[in-house]
Amino acid sequence: MGSRIKQNPETTFEVYVEVAYPRTGGTLSDPEVQRQFPEDYSDQEVLQTLTKFCFPFYVDSLTVSQVGQNFTFVLTDIDSKQRFGFCRLSSGAKSCFCILSYLPWFEVFYKLLNILADYTTKRQENQWNELLETLHKLPIPDPGVSVHLSVHSYFTVPDTRELPSIPENRNLTEYFVAVDVNNMLHLYASMLYERRILIICSKLSTLTACIHGSAAMLYPMYWQHVYIPVLPPHLLDYCCAPMPYLIGIHLSLMEKVRNMALDDVVILNVDTNTLETPFDDLQSLPNDVISSLKNRLKKVSTTTGDGVARAFLKAQAAFFGSYRNALKIEPEEPITFCEEAFVSHYRSGAMRQFLQNATQLQLFKQFIDGRLDLLNSGEGFSDVFEEEINMGEYAGSDKLYHQWLSTVRKGSGAILNTVKTKANPAMKTVYKFAKDHAKMGIKEVKNRLKQKDIAENGCAPTPEEQLPKTAPSPLVEAKDPKLREDRRPITVHFGQVRPPRPHVVKRPKSNIAVEGRRTSVPSPEQPQPYRTLRESDSAEGDEAESPEQQVRKSTGPVPAPPDRAASIDLLEDVFSNLDMEAALQPLGQAKSLEDLRAPKDLREQPGTFDYQRLDLGGSERSRGVTVALKLTHPYNKLWSLGQDDMAIPSKPPAASPEKPSALLGNSLALPRRPQNRDSILNPSDKEEVPTPTLGSITIPRPQGRKTPELGIVPPPPIPRPAKLQAAGAALGDVSERLQTDRDRRAALSPGLLPGVVPQGPTELLQPLSPGPGAAGTSSDALLALLDPLSTAWSGSTLPSRPATPNVATPFTPQFSFPPAGTPTPFPQPPLNPFVPSMPAAPPTLPLVSTPAGPFGAPPASLGPAFASGLLLSSAGFCAPHRSQPNLSALSMPNLFGQMPMGTHTSPLQPLGPPAVAPSRIRTLPLARSSARAAETKQGLALRPGDPPLLPPRPPQGLEPTLQPSAPQQARDPFEDLLQKTKQDVSPSPALAPAPDSVEQLRKQWETFE
């Protein structure tokens, strides 16, 4: 590759000498060798040359005290290989210690010279001999190996294949400190054009460091012309040589050099940091490459490490990285390089002009010849330059490089035959070369895409896997866009149930999965297309597999990103109690809530119940995944079925956190009809209504808590009077009360419907017409519902629900659902973890459970307030487009005294038996004999634009049923308030007109008169 470094020297160093000026008669003569090792070294020509290079300055110069201590010169042997002379000047520059070696170990030999100088000063001859003998007999160690020469002398072998770094590399460090960026760029351009270059400095260590450092920036190319890091006085005529050179001159010799005829010489003065050049080499280079290089060098982050060297390496790759596209590969023929193809590849005029000149440069020719020699000899090569080309894709080299590999594959028959017969080592090298670079290219591109994906999503893939998995082949994923879509980062999936997967995983076309890790790498025989990191894992197998692959093979907890670790740890008890059949599908990974869409045709989706999809027949808004509960009580098995914990209609009182399910009675069923997600939501309510399945989240519980606690995602900021946050606050004026009720309209969840219906399969779909002709028993039940002062409601205890009759109570209004068009529902586990699943329900009926309330046998401490409304998923059925009944929270000291104050707008808490409100916004507090009337809670209010859920007015004969009972003689404390607001209360125009007597009766009932 044009390197002038000898690859396998026989010894670590050739000779060690101590050179000094002998004093004869008070005058200085030529320097002489005072001592040498080994003593039998017989190359007198080398020894004479060493003595002159050890003092490359005028000894009687005034600047002799500034020469510094360590410097390096270079001697070229007959094979054009460089031998480095590492020197250390003594104080006063009268003597010099020098080691001549083929190894460019600058820091190592500088350290050894200091030790040897110390031994010489202290006259420790034994240590001096022992150190030199050990070093001279030492076999050349491998890079990175620590070598111990004596008790106090050891070193680590440097790796010359790596990029030089700051401050480890002494030459690059001094060069970067001494020369500014602009002069470095000018010097770099002059070296690319192979100019005659002189570098001047008054300090020898800095001078030689600048020469070696600037030449190292040409990697992977090497300066092929005259190379003299420090020029001795007897060779000053080299400055007039017509060929290109790179020479360093001490400042004491520069005055004589100025008197020479120097034509077209680039001079860099390091002391003054100035550069003189008659050429416009920097301006003639492609501007985009130079601008990028300049920006990288000026960044503070590149001042340490290999940033400076890598910046120049990127520039070299941008200039010459497409050389591989010009390689001509023919079967049974040596690989050659086509200069025309190399130049014509680029469209830019500046780049074409530069490359046309570059093909004539000696350093580029030596580089190409070195690469071709390695390929044709069968050795091959792989270095940081090739890695940079693969990673950077400079000048479209990635695409053309794979075209080159395709060309290799087209002649695969001849190549494979050649490899098998081992007749042509060049073809065998091409095969290995192409395979190695295919591996390198895939790895580097995926690493770049991985970094880009992490930057965009803010989350890395899961770091480890728990079970062996069968990874689908990339070709299967490329053909199946659904698989590719499903393999998104877990940050996108989290919070949404995935659509069902096929139960049988497609078998990979190639055996690329072993113990759950992808180990196959694209080869020239079987190319694999580039895929983003979301579609494929790393070829090395050290990146994590996608979460979907883990879900397919395991019914255990799904691994989550590191930031979710705390929440996922809480799932161990939930999933450990799963009791599923083998036929059930694995739980699909969750998606984000933005991707929720209602099914277009719900009849096409089969109603199969498993814990992967909870509601195949309804909208996806009713789905949920338990993500943050760790249950330690016996009811965790009900929660582990995958039901959304956000849909629990009630919170058990703190006095009895673990009531047995026997106290809560049986669960009840309600017919559900499919509807789209927007059928019962106004546009203004879609963002503000905290529905249990969309707006609610679950707060992760502390480990010590036993009962679940619900959290509500706060709606957009709404002005809310402070009196709503206290139970016993004063009412305030009428306008404030009305404004408060308007502000609370958004809190009414359309999915919160009170009441229950019979469980019989025949009565589930029986309609109850709300038309004007409805009367009789249905009217009696609905009219009884309108009476908030019913004795059954005001009683402290409620009768148990009969086991056999399927008759609705006066407090459980039936809902009219037309029997036609109702799809076949399917069972669903109860939403309340404390209520067992309904065992006798038909398999095609949806179960939306509710606390048993008045129909069970609640403890006396619970009171009638546990007759909570049935909580429905807002997207689970098609209710008529009408408002829901107002739920008035009554004064239940034994229950509401324990409820948190922040839950007064939550649709999740029990609100007692319902009371139907008029069309205007109004809250009907009920006067009770209890002295705690001040603790009355505010109920949920209706929207004024929606008609109330009211039946038609009853006949005149039924009017006495609306008359209030005994409590009407007691003066209502809110009578004055309601009298003032009576003019605002009017029946909704959507209702059928009723007689005046009914109107008066209704107003009389509303005002408790």
From Swiss-Prot:
Record's compositionally biased regions (Low complexity): 986-997
UniProt PTM: Phosphorylated on serine and/or threonine in an Akt-dependent manner. Phosphorylation probably regulates the guanine nucleotide exchange factor (GEF) activity, possibly by disrupting an intramolecular interaction between the DENN domain and the C-terminus of the protein, thereby relieving the autoinhibition.
Cellular location(s): Cytoplasmic vesicle, Clathrin-coated vesicle membrane; Presynaptic cell membrane
Gene Ontology annotations for the cellular component aspect, listed alphabetically: cell projection; clathrin-coated vesicle; clathrin-coated vesicle membrane; cytosol; intracellular membrane-bounded organelle; presynaptic membrane
Region: Disordered, residue numbers: 453-564, 648-714, 796-831, 928-1009
Domain cDENN: 162-298
Subunit structure, interactors included: Interacts with RAB35. Interacts with clathrin and with the adapter protein complex 2, AP-2. Interacts with ITSN1 and SH3GL2. Interacts (when phosphorylated) with YWHAE.
Protein name: DENN domain-containing protein 1A
Organism for this UniProt entry: Homo sapiens (Human)
